[in-house]
Swiss-Prot record:
Residues 184-195 have a biased composition (Low complexity). PANTHER family: 50S RIBOSOMAL PROTEIN L9. Keywords: Ribonucleoprotein, Ribosomal protein, RNA-binding, rRNA-binding. Coiled coil: none annotated. The keyword Transport does not apply. The keyword RNA-binding applies. It comes from the Bacteria. One of its GO terms (cellular component) is ribosome. GO terms for biological process: translation. It comes from Anaplasma phagocytophilum (strain HZ). One of its GO terms (molecular function) is rRNA binding. This is Large ribosomal subunit protein bL9. Residues 160-205 are annotated as: Disordered. Binds to the 23S rRNA.
Length: 205
């Protein structure tokens, strides 16, 4: 068996950058096809350096994604769609529609990064998942309404609810009990009284 470094992911063998052990014939095929390189000491060192750079880049992208997720959490996403009196949409909301809505608000999100668990065919509130990074999926609320008047009422209600939650959270922090350090507080008078008693005892002696 020969050890090779995979230059691309191969099903059943490993991911790009991983070391795989294969038969000599298969190793020659992978090397000739440019899908792998020999696992020499120098190549292993180069791989380690490349992986370190890739990890740092991934961490940087994750930090940026966390900022985007925080911004998304502060938004109110409202989509206006035509619907019947009973709330059934004339059509449905697709992932591309959600991506377009987010894009109109300045978020660079592709349709393939948006997914939800149910088909949106009615007026209402829905949870939308946005994959910002391989390790981070933001969950946002989407409100589907009939017209601009409903949209404005929804925005105001969401703003009031958030204000109430923030106020409640701030109140809980203020009302949180302060832990007692356990230090005993002794008054000056009691210390003086003890000193006086000690002097009196000494005088008797």
């Amino acid at each position: 068996m020969l050890s090779v470094i995979l230059k691309s992911s191969i099903r059943g063998l490993g991911k790009a950058g991983e070391v795989a052990k294969v038969r000599p014939g298969y190793a020659r095929y992978l090397l000739a096809d440019g899908k792998a390189m020999r696992a020499t000491k120098r190549n292993m060192e180069l791989l380690a350096e490349k992986l370190a750079v890739m990890e740092e880049e991934s961490n940087q992208k994750l930090r940026e994604a966390e900022k985007v997720a925080e911004a998304l959490a502060g938004e109110c996403f409202v989509m206006i769609r035509q619907a019947s009196d009973d709330g059934k949409l004339f059509g449905s909301v697709a992932v591309r529609d959600v991506a377009k809505l987010l894009g109109s608000l300045g978020y660079n999100v592709q349709p393939k990064e948006v997914f939800f668990s149910e088909v949106i065919k009615r007026i209402g509130e829905y949870e939308i998942n946005v994959e910002l990074h391989a390790d981070l999926v933001a969950v946002v609320k989407l409100y589907v309404v009939r017209n601009e008047a409903e949209a404005e009422r929804t925005r105001l209600q969401v703003a009031r609810d958030r204000k109430s939650r923030n106020a409640a959270a701030a109140s809980e922090v203020q009302d949180a009990p302060v832990e007692d350090g356990g230090d005993e507080v002794v008054s000056v008078d009691s210390v003086a009284a003890e000193d006086g008693g000690a002097d009196a005892s000494g005088g008797t002696a």
